[in-house]
Amino acid sequence: MGYPGKSHKTYDRPRKPWEADRMANEVELIKTYGLRNKRELWKAESILRKYRRVGRMLLASKARGEARADIEAAAVINRLSRFGILKDGADLDAILSLKITDILERRLQTQVYRQGLANTIRQARQFITHGHIQVAGQRVTVPSYLVKRGDEMTIDYYAGSPLAREGHPERSSKIVARTGGSA
């Protein structure tokens, strides 16, 4: 056992480091979602792996007829649906069918780009790390922050940021059109 106050790795490296198909898939995901390195992708895979493992254990518990299985399954499904990873009313089989893109779509970096607050996925990352983005009134500077479904509509430019002004040249043309300003 280790010291509980010490930070530990939140990801596992691939067992076969030079597998060509996996490497090509990773590069494509990194380009699509604007990740800086494969470690960020491996962290998302670890999150997915954890929930799929829990889903398998809960399915086995239900098959054995354990009483707590239904309560624990409802809690896990509720948590994943709060983050927008699962749809409302999903079941345990839906957890097993999750893909890595379901996790990556919930990152703040992806949400900022999809909502049109940035012109590119890389610009979205820059806006976040420079403190130009807020979620529910709080400045967030972590691109990998997983956005809850309820907070999705509260993503906006930070009030103290120069980007909050309508005429700022770096503002996305989509957001200017959405707010009624002139582009």
Curated annotation (Swiss-Prot):
One of the primary rRNA binding proteins, it binds directly to 16S rRNA where it nucleates assembly of the body of the 30S subunit. The keyword tRNA processing does not apply. GO terms for cellular component: small ribosomal subunit. Belongs to the universal ribosomal protein uS4 family. Part of the 30S ribosomal subunit. Contacts protein S5. The interaction surface between S4 and S5 is involved in control of translational fidelity. It holds the Pfam family S4. This is Small ribosomal subunit protein uS4. It comes from Methanothrix thermoacetophila (strain DSM 6194 / JCM 14653 / NBRC 101360 / PT). The lineage of its organism: Archaea, Methanobacteriati, Methanobacteriota, Stenosarchaea group, Methanomicrobia.
